[in-house]
């Protein structure tokens, strides 16, 4: 074959490879196995999983944990995972869905048995790392997973504080000199330990043709813990937790957009609280765009509005009183799943309702830059005030389009069990998942 023909063939293959990347983006579906333990309309069944799988490229089972004494990876719900064989149930679907990769995730803020076992793991040296790696590989192989997702529970950034203009200026001045924003004085050492762990873990998994992904949890400072250029070659993809920048638990006194795509300027906002900043950080660290998946949440964050919060609902909303009451399905203060949020929108069943069942006012973001919100001002007694920041199918679709436009790997959905998987709102099951998939096609 002549040199020109070889060149033409090489160029054609390169074009085809690029087309393949852009034509088949990732839709990484996180599945919180605790959803199968919920009651009533919130219970997520194997039938629900099967319906969702037609839209996913990867299914990530959450979650395993780390034993704080011996650093081995272990089940954190042995009754469900092992005795009821839920791990095996999930991977048994591989035969029917051979195009999907099934991963087991460790951490993910679900491992609450010990507060700092992940830092202890990093500091445990080669022996501790080896125990974790061997146990992780054994667990993944025993239950026939295709790989491991590493969702390390590392110290979080301190939340934004509420101050007046003068107070904010003084606080910034003070922080510059005292460094009181630092939450981990050993972060540089820990970064090196994370790098070593990921490289060794990847090498061990690759011996058995297993995948390794990294999930960066919300509000974990990537620059503190992840040496991106060093770890990227060892990772098949990276899921960014680009949501929960503000939550009622972290920011009880003010409500604001929890998952904006771009920076919402003004009002003492922090420039890194948005999807675009986080994604650009990894790109600037020379991580290939097609290894980055942006995270989209299927739930919203909800604050309790007080009389002093006003009645406009426009963020930043002052004088909030922490998390709003839990929803009837999600049963978690300060969090409402998409079905619960949708049911609060004006509809025939709540048009005359008052008090906690009164409808909310929906405010759509026409720019698609910040996200939608909904609110119900507090009544004359200061009760029943509610403010919700959320992504809906429209904004999720816009974020998926963002991922396509930036030639990213795709989207990671957190998670299937908080989507409207029963179609309670519009009779359309998994509306968030579907909206993302159709935009990624």
Swiss-Prot record:
Residues covered by the GH18 domain: 25-441
Reported impact of residue 46 to I: In strain: MB25a
GO MF, any single term: chitin binding
Residue positions with a glycan: 221
Compartments where located: Secreted
Mutagenesis / variant outcome for changing residue 183 to M: In strain: MB47a
Record carries keyword Iron: no
CDD domains: GH18_IDGF (cd02873)
Result after altering residue 47 to N: In strain: MB25a
Pfam families reported for this sequence: Glyco_hydro_18
Documented effect of changing residue 14 to V: In strain: MB01a, MB13a, MB15b and MB46b
Alphabetical list of InterPro entries matching this protein: Chitinase_II/V-like_cat, Chitinase_insertion_sf, Glyco_hydro18_cat, Glycoside_hydrolase_SF, Glycosyl_Hydrlase_18, IDGF
Disulfide topology: 29-56, 342-425
Region (Disordered): 307-331
One GO process term, biological-process aspect: carbohydrate metabolic process
Keyword set, alphabetical order: Developmental protein, Disulfide bond, Glycoprotein, Secreted, Signal
TM region positions: none
Signal peptide extent: 1-23
Functional summary from the UniProt entry: Cooperates with insulin-like peptides to stimulate the proliferation, polarization and motility of imaginal disk cells. May act by stabilizing the binding of insulin-like peptides to its receptor through a simultaneous interaction with both molecules to form a multiprotein signaling complex.
PANTHER family: CHITINASE (PTHR11177), CHITINASE-LIKE PROTEIN IDGF1-RELATED (PTHR11177:SF235)
UniProt protein name: Chitinase-like protein Idgf3
Organism: Drosophila melanogaster (Fruit fly)
Gene this protein is translated from: Idgf3
């Amino acid at each position: 074959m002549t040199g020109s023909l070889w060149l033409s063939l090489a160029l054609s293959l390169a074009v085809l490879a690029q087309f393949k990347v852009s034509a088949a983006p990732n839709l990484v579906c996180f599945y919180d196995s605790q959803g199968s333990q919920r009651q009533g309309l919130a219970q997520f069944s194997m039938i629900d999983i099967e319906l969702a799988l037609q839209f996913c490229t990867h299914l990530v089972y959450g979650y395993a944990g780390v034993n704080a004494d011996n650093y081995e990876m272990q089940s954190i719900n042995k009754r469900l995972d092992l005795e009821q064989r839920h791990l095996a149930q999930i991977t048994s679907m591989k035969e029917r869905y051979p195009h999907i990769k099934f991963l087991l995730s460790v951490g993910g803020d679900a491992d609450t048995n010990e507060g700092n076992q992940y830092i202890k793991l990093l500091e445990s040296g080669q022996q501790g790392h080896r125990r974790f790696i061997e146990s992780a590989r054994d667990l993944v192989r025993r239950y026939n997973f295709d790989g491991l997702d590493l969702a390390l529970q590392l110290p979080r950034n301190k939340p934004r504080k509420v101050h007046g203009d003068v107070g904010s200026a003084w606080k910034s001045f003070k922080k510059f000199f005292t460094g009181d924003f630092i939450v981990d004085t050993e972060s540089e050492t820990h970064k090196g330990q994370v790098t070593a762990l990921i490289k060794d873990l990847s090498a061990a998994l690759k011996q058995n043709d297993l995948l390794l992904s990294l999930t960066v949890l919300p509000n974990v400072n990537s620059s503190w813990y992840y040496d991106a250029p060093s770890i990227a070659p060892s990772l098949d993809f990276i899921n960014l937790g680009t949501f929960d920048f503000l939550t009622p638990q972290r920011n009880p006194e003010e409500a604001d957009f929890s998952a904006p795509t771009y920076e919402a300027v003004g009002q003492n906002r922090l420039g890194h609280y948005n999807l675009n900043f986080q994604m650009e950080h990894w790109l600037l660290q020379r991580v290939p765009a097609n290894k980055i998946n942006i995270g989209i949440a299927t739930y919203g964050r909800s604050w309790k509005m007080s009389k002093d919060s006003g009645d406009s609902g426009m963020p930043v909303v002052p004088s909030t009183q922490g998390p709003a009451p839990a929803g009837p399905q999600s049963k978690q203060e300060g969090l409402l799943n998409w079905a619960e949020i949708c049911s609060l929108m004006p509809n025939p069943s709540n048009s005359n309702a008052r008090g906690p069942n009164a409808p909310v006012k929906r405010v759509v973001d026409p720019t698609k830059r910040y996200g939608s919100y909904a609110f119900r001002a507090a009544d004359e007694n200061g009760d029943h005030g509610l403010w919700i920041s959320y992504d809906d199918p429209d904004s999720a679709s816009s974020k998926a389009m963002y991922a396509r436009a930036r030639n990213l790997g795709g989207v990671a959905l957190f998670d299937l069990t908080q989507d409207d998987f029963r179609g309670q709102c519009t009779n359309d099951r998994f509306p968030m998942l579907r909206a993302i998939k159709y935009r990624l096609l």
